[in-house]
């Protein structure tokens, strides 16, 4: 019910426009720093990140007229969120092309083969997955009673997708850099 109410919004209809009260929280259309009145209303123990953001722009750079002796680490606004794994994978595929795609497919096939071999050998995979920290509801939904060995292996293979994607994201640039250094690949073309 709460999900339906969130979809409908406060006006009770889908797509109702709501004017936000704190436009400075949106980031893209408003400055990153909250207005001075909002800073005065915050509790006395202010977060250092909030103070750095209020003193400078949203990337941690300060106005030279307001510079202090301390240097803060780079702070980003909420508008600059980290990309998801799938977005990072698409970027790798666009940048490295067939090398990225073929390496990811190779890693996926090896992973599926290993999980098929483990499941067909009779290892109790649900117990291992629970020890690794997967939720019991997730494990039970992926492993219904009476499913074939391949289906169970494929379900476990899908559970480990973030690991495979991370391996691809780390290894593709390293492999391409090595092959370019050896001379197997041409250096990248200069962008106009």
UniProtKB/Swiss-Prot annotation:
This is Protein FAM210B, mitochondrial. Keywords: Differentiation, Erythrocyte maturation, Membrane, Mitochondrion, Mitochondrion outer membrane, Transit peptide, Transmembrane, Transmembrane helix, Tumor suppressor. The keyword Transmembrane helix applies. InterPro entries: FAM210A/B-like, FAM210A/B-like_dom. It is found in: Mitochondrion; Mitochondrion outer membrane. Residues 1-58 form a transit peptide. Residues 63-77 have a biased composition (Polar residues). Residues 57-80 are annotated as: Disordered. GO terms for cellular component: membrane; mitochondrial outer membrane; mitochondrion. The gene is FAM210B. Pfam families: FAM210A-B_dom. Residues 80-191 form the DUF1279 domain. It is a multi-pass membrane protein. It comes from the Eukaryota. Plays a role in erythroid differentiation. Involved in cell proliferation and tumor cell growth suppression. Involved in the metabolic reprogramming of cancer cells in a PDK4-dependent manner. Its main location: mitochondrion. Belongs to the FAM210 family. One of its GO terms (biological process) is reactive oxygen species metabolic process. Induction: Up-regulated by the erythroid transcription factor GATA1. Expressed in late erythroblast differentiation stages. Underexpressed in ovarian cancer epithelia cells compared with normal human ovarian surface epithelia. The chain crosses the membrane at residues 99-119, 150-170.
């Amino acid at each position: 019910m709460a999900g339906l109410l969130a979809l409908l919004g406060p006006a009770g209809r889908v797509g109702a426009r709501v004017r936000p009260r704190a436009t400075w929280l949106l980031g893209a259309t408003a400055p990153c720093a909250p207005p001075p009145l909002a800073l005065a209303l915050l509790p006395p123990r202010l977060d250092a990140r909030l103070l750095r953001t209020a003193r400078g722009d949203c990337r941690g750079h300060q106005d030279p007229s307001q510079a202090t002796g301390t240097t803060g680490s780079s702070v980003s606004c909420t508008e600059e969120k980290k990309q998801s794994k799938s977005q990072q994978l698409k970027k790798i595929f666009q940048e490295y092309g067939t090398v990225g795609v073929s390496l990811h497919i190779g890693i996926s096939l090896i992973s599926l083969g290993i999980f098929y071999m483990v499941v067909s050998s009779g290892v109790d995979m649900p117990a291992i997955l629970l020890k690794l920290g997967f939720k019991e509801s997730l494990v039970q939904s992926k492993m219904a009673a009476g499913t074939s060995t391949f289906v169970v292996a494929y379900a476990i293979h899908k559970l480990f997708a973030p690991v495979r994607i991370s391996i691809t994201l780390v290894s593709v640039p390293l492999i391409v850099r090595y092959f370019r250094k050896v001379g197997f690949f041409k250096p990248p073309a200069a962008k106009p």
